[in-house]
């Protein structure tokens, strides 16, 4: 997993400036002109505009295809270098006037992964500008290890009579 400072630098924030602080819970926040970046100790990244006139994270236009590409590119930048097998895919697009939300979910070998806390990522646009982004920083990997759904004693208790645990 990449450090909060590395993620901040990847997004163009100065991780060594005076506008960086970490609270007692381990949440790190970076503030720079137009945006606030927060990375929680639990692995949730939030990027939000602190004014309405931002251009730093912006799509080419307000067209849906450009917004989706901007959101995908932003998420790709944040997750680059991850060795995880799961990937984020667009699963929903919500439009309400000038506001558009691109919703992404993690998929592992074509199977959706729904972490506690909602969708894998949500990128909110006002016009063509990103006004808020939320990403659950997760790394799902495939394994060949067999995992029991139930402990053996419980599994045996629900087996039909005459059956054996395999």
Name what the model sees in each region:
Residues 53-60, 66-115, 127, 131-166:
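Segments that shape or occlude catalytic/ligand-binding pockets
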